[in-house]
């Protein structure tokens, strides 16, 4: 396995932006594992006509559908059966479906080999919910980015408004709290702080400050 910088944390903690910049600074490839889960969710949303509750599907039904999914990830873009779905998977509705499906063990088992395969070829910065604990437990460097629910909701609210989506701050906060509950309480690979991960609370830090802290820590322990 090549060098892996694994970054975990809840939704809205700044993982994606920080991870991209860290990868750029180190000359590593960036792996957005959340995009892989979103691609699966996008497939299921189309297949089942955007049903609201995917818990209605049995594990066997999900497993059968996974056999039809072919995901390719390159340069930050996600392809589903050859189609670039990178923009479609960012829809808030897909995010909700992703949060539901990611609790399923069959989905996590399906994506595990794909995620790990990237580290066999190149040095990577991998961000997600279980990078430091499950996918890359022996990662070269481990970080956990966090922030208060209010701060994360504000970031999500501003991001969605800028992208043209209509949402209130209260809705954004409720979504963050619900995601936290699902991520931390799920039976399979719950979100948790790895004992050997470096913890960073980004609530009152600028993006550049977070990046500087991560790069300094990487340099110190290199």
UniProtKB/Swiss-Prot annotation:
Q: What is its EC number?
A: 2.7.4.25
Segment forming the signal sequence:
none
Q: Which Pfam families match?
A: Cytidylate_kin
Protein origin, superkingdom: Bacteria
Query: What compartments host this protein?
Result: Cytoplasm
| UniProt-listed GO biological process terms | nucleobase-containing small molecule interconversion; pyrimidine nucleotide metabolic process
What is the enzyme's main class?
transferase
- Is Cytoplasm there in the keyword field? yes
Please provide, alphabetically and separated by semicolons, the GO molecular function terms listed in this UniProt record.
(d)CMP kinase activity; ATP binding; CMP kinase activity; dCMP kinase activity
The record's keywords, sorted A to Z, are:
ATP-binding, Cytoplasm, Kinase, Nucleotide-binding, Transferase
The family annotation for this protein states: Belongs to the cytidylate kinase family. Type 1 subfamily.
Q: What is this protein called?
A: Cytidylate kinase
- Source species, please? Thermodesulfovibrio yellowstonii (strain ATCC 51303 / DSM 11347 / YP87)
């Amino acid at each position: 396995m090549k060098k892996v910088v694994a970054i975990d944390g809840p939704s809205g903690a700044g993982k994606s932006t920080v991870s991209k910049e860290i990868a750029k600074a180190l000359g590593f490839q960036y792996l957005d594992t959340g995009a892989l889960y979103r691609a699966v969710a996008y497939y299921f949303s189309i297949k089942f006509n955007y049903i609201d509750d995917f818990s209605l599907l049995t594990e066997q039904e999900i497993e059968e559908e996974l056999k039809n999914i072919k995901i390719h990830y390159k340069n930050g873009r996600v392809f589903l059966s050859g189609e670039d779905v990178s923009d479609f998977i960012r829809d808030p509705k897909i995010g909700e479906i992703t949060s539901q499906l990611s609790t399923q063990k069959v989905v996590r088992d399906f994506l595990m080999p794909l995620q790990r395969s990237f580290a066999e070829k190149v040095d990577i910065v991998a961000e997600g919910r279980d990078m430091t604990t499950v996918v890359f437990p022996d990662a070269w460097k481990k970080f956990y980015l966090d922030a208060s629910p209010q701060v994360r909701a504000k970031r999500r609210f501003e991001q969605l408004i800028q992208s043209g989506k209509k949402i209130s701050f209260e809705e954004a906060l409720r979504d963050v709290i619900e995601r936290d509950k699902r991520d931390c309480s799920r039976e399979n690979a719950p979100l948790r702080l790895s004992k050997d991960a470096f913890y960073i609370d980004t609530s009152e830090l600028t993006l550049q400050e977070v990046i500087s802290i991560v790069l300094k820590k990487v340099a110190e322990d290199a």
